[in-house]
C-alpha cells in the first residue's frame, strides 16, 4: 500500500502548485497597481471576486519564478522532516485485504478450472509464472473444521492435472473417484486398509543410489523410535542399511523380473542365519560368494562385504532387528500387494492421473510404505522433468500432492529441500495440519522453513492456543487511535479528553479462537490477509458426480442451486473395489526374457479371475 500512498501524495503536491502560481501572478499584478496595506488588501479582495481578471505584467515572471523555486524547496524540507514518520502506521501497518480484489489479481481469467480454490471468493491461478507465487499451500484446521470438505474436495473436483491423495479411511476415494474418472482422470488406488491395489517399490529402482534410498527408508521408517539416532544406534542403523541395500541390489541386478520385489528380500533375510562359528556359511554367504567370484566389484557384493565386517553376534542382532521391524512383510495380503506394481508413477507428469493412497487413521503399521511412495514419487517426477529435453525441466501436467495427515506420516528425509525445488518442476504440495504444534514437534528445526516455502496459507479454525498465537502474529499489528477521558468531581469539576496512537493485533489470539466456523483466513505471500467465507462445496459444478450431491447430510445443500445429474450416469457403488492387478498391456510391452509365455498366461488367468 505504501507506493500507492506516495503516488497520491505526489499528485496532491502538484495540484497545490496551481493555486500558488495563480496567487503569485495576482500579487505581482496588485503590487504594481497598489501601494500600502489597505490598497493591497482591496486588490486581493477584488481578485478573489474575479479570479479571471489576471493580467500579465513586468513583475509576473519574478513572482512565478520565486514560487517555482521556493515551493519545491519547501515541500522537500517538509518531506525530509517527515521521512522517518509514517502517519497512521507508527505501531504497525497491518490491515484486512479485500477478497474480491485479491481474487482479481490471482485468478485465472482464461480457464477457471486451472485454479486453486482457497475460499469462497479467492482463487489462485495454476500459472505460477504469471503471479510469481508458488502453488504450495499450508492448510491449518482442527478436527471438524472442514479441511476435506472446504479445501481438498473442491480442489480435487477441479481435475486440472494429476493428483496424489493421502486418504485416511478411504473417504476421498469413494467420494471423488467416480467424479475424476468422469472428467478424464485415470484413477489408481492403493489401499492399506483392505489390502487392495499393487505397489512394488523395487519396480522403480534404476540406479544403485535408488536402492540405497529404499534401504534407508526401510530402516528408518520402520524403527519404533526414529528419533533415536546417533552413537551406538547410528552404527546399528548404518549396518542395517548396508545389509538391506546388499539384498535389494542383488534382487535388482540378479533376480528374474517376477522376483524383483520386497517379498524376495524378506525371503533372503530369513535365510541369513548367522552362526557363532566364523567358518560356517549360510545360504546368503554362498549366494554372494558365487556372485563375488563372477563379479568382485558388483554393488551388491560391496555392500554385503562391508556388512559382514561385524562380529557374528552383531550381525545376528542386526538381522533379528531387521526381521522384527519388517514383520509386516510376512502378511500374506500385504505381500501380494507389493509383489507387482500398477502405480506407474512417472505417468502422473505426462497425463492426468490420480493416485488414492488409503491408510487407516488409527494404525500406523504401514505408514512406512507411504514414506517410500512419497520418496519414489518425487524421485521419478524429478528425473522425468530433468531428463526429458522437450520438457525443459518442467512437467507438462501439473502434479499436486494432497498431503493429509502430514504430521502423522513419515515424509522423505530431504523433504525441506524437495519442497523448495518442486515448483520449478510443476509440482505442488498441500500440507494439511490440525494445528501448528504438529509440525513443530515433527520438524523441530525446519518447521518455519517448510511453512516459509509455501506462499499461501489457509486457516479454517480450531482449538489450539499455540495456533491462535501463531496466526495472530502472522496477521501482524495495526495502528489505532485510543481516547482517554478524565473527570474531576467536586464544586469545580472538570473533564478532559486525550487521544493517543497505539498498536493492536489485527486479530488477538482470543479473536482467532472465536472466529466463526463459516469463516476462514487466507494469506498469500506479499498480500494483506483476507477474512472470507469457506468455500461452499455445493457451488462446484462437478459435485453432481459425487455421493455428496445426493447426501442428505450437511446444511449447505439447502442453499445450493440444484444441478441435475447427467442422463444415464450412475455412481460406482465402491470405487476401491476396482483396484485390480498389473495391467496385461504393460506386461506385454516388456521384452525381458524372464517374461515367458507361461507367466503371461498365468497373469491373464489371474486377471480374468478378478473380473
Q: Where are the regions a protein language model picked out?
A:
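Basic- and hydrophobic-enriched, low-structure N-terminal and domain-boundary segments
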Residues: 1-145, 149-152, 477, 488-489
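Short secondary-structure boundary/capping segments
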Residues: 179-182, 204-205, 445-449, 473-478, ...
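A broad, low-specificity signal for short, low-complexity segments enriched in glycine/proline
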Residues: 95-104, 113-114, 119-129, 149-150, ...
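Short loop or secondary-structure boundary microenvironments that flank
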Residues: 359, 363, 405, 433, ...
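Extended alpha-helical interface modules used as scaffolds for assembling large macromolecular complexes
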Residues: 505, 544-547
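Conserved ATP-driven motor cores of ASCE-family P-loop NTPases powering translocation/secretion/packaging/pilus
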Residues: 419-521
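General secondary-structure edge motif
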Residues: 92-94, 119, 131, 135-136, ...
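P-loop NTPase motor domains
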Residues: 25, 133-427, 442, 452, ...
